[in-house]
Amino acid sequence: MRMPTNLQHPNMTAIASLPRSQNALKIVSPNTFHVDANAPLPTLVDHDSVLIRVVCVAINPVDGKSADLSATAGATSGTDFAGIVVALPPDTNSEPDDDALKIGDRVMGFVFGNNPQGRDNGAFAEYVTVPRRLLWRLPAHMSLETAASLPASLASVGMAMHYLQIPLSSLQSAISKSIASSSAAAAADDEGPFVLVYGGGTSTGCMAIQILRLAGFVPVTCCSSSSAARALSLGAAATFDYASATCGRDVREHTHDSLALAIDCISDSASMSICYEAIGGGGGRYVALDPFPVRGCVRRSVVPDWICTLTQFGRPVAWAPPYNIDERPGDRRFAEEWYRLAQRMLDAHVIRAPTLETRTGGLASVPEGISEVRMGEVKRKKLVYNIVEQKAAA
């Protein structure tokens, strides 16, 4: 078989036929999109790239934020997807590993959409390419809709723990122990170190609470009163209303002035201030999911940092400042190990997905969802779209 020109790779294993073009949601200008019905398929940049036929996609805040702050005209949008493997790197089937990916496998992943250096690749399209070591295979119990809601949060929590300087070896050991205990709830106790998760009602906050419990930490969270019950059910030891004037002080008292680690899933001046107030007198580390306001660095004993999960690919991020980031090979190395560990959690069925709202209309309906998420109109749920439903029904 001859691969389409832009997909050629020596000895690549693929399904019998692939189209020469696809439908893809392209960025036209800041927060303006259109469906290109004749878009090229993504180029296989890495020697270990996998081509996936996308079935479901989910919307993340970064999809609208990046298209607003650093729009790349002609780039495919989207980060979270789930689909079916249709082409593999040449040496995959020769690997002795029984867990090696195979054509037809159901997978999910997080991709660099709106990429100035890879405009043909993004989740909001019929095909996407991702390095094989940065993919998760779906467990039998998981639907493609559910899977599409998980990758960005799962990848971001891992990167946040990496930037908190929690050793990977300790994560592997503790999570293995929790998996052996069947669930985070069965393994949970309140004797480990506290970690504050600010934004426990967000998708990433909910994921962080679960994984921190599995890793032997005691998560406490700042969230709205309407998110508190779910946060507790996911493993939070305590919740604190971020609207309270004493929120930071209350966290500090509850944690006996011992809190040393904080993950800020909101990352604005107010959230940073509360995190800094909550961290104990001995100081600690604060990691935000976005650039933090420098004026918020009011304690020398607290070391601040922020993550851009796109660094997991080991390539530069060429967005507008402050999101112009040189490649970070260490983040790629960590991510590959983290994905292996997270696969074990997925297989063990110890991760709960967010509440989903599955919408119809395919790619053409996605811009409306991006706008709703960007405007803060979507609360405590994830928007998911099945982009092949209309063709499947035809």
Curated annotation (Swiss-Prot):
Pathway participation: Secondary metabolite biosynthesis
Residues given in the record as NADP(+) binding sites: V62, D63, G64, K65, S224, S225, S226, S227, Y242, L289, D290, V378, K379
SUPFAM superfamilies tied to this protein: GroES-like (SSF50129), NAD(P)-binding Rossmann-fold domains (SSF51735)
Residues where substrate binds: A152, S153, L154, A155, S156, V157, G158, M159, T309, L310, T311, Q312, F313
Keywords: NADP, Oxidoreductase
GO molecular function: oxidoreductase activity, acting on NAD(P)H
InterPro entries (UniProt xref): ADH-like_C, ADH-like_N, GroES-like_sf, NAD(P)-bd_dom_sf, PKS_ER, Trans-enoyl_RdTase-like
Pfam families reported for this sequence: ADH_N (PF08240), ADH_zinc_N (PF00107)
Enzyme's top EC category: oxidoreductase
The keyword Signal belongs to this UniProt entry's keyword annotation: no
Superkingdom of origin: Eukaryota
EC number: 1.-.-.-
Disulfide bonds: none
Quaternary structure note: Monomer.
Record-stated family: Belongs to the zinc-containing alcohol dehydrogenase family.
PANTHER family xref list: HYPOTHETICAL OXIDOREDUCTASE (EUROFUNG), TRANS-ENOYL REDUCTASE APDC
Its biological purpose: Trans-enoyl reductase; part of the gene cluster that mediates the biosynthesis of fumosorinone, a 2-pyridone alkaloid that acts as an inhibitor of protein tyrosine phosphatase 1B which is implicated asa negative regulator of insulin receptor signaling and a potential drug target for the treatment of type II diabetes and other associated metabolic syndromes. The polyketide-amino acid backbone of fumosorinone is first assembled by the PKS-NRPS hybrid fumoS.
UniProt name for this protein: Trans-enoyl reductase fumoC
Source organism: Cordyceps fumosorosea (strain ARSEF 2679)
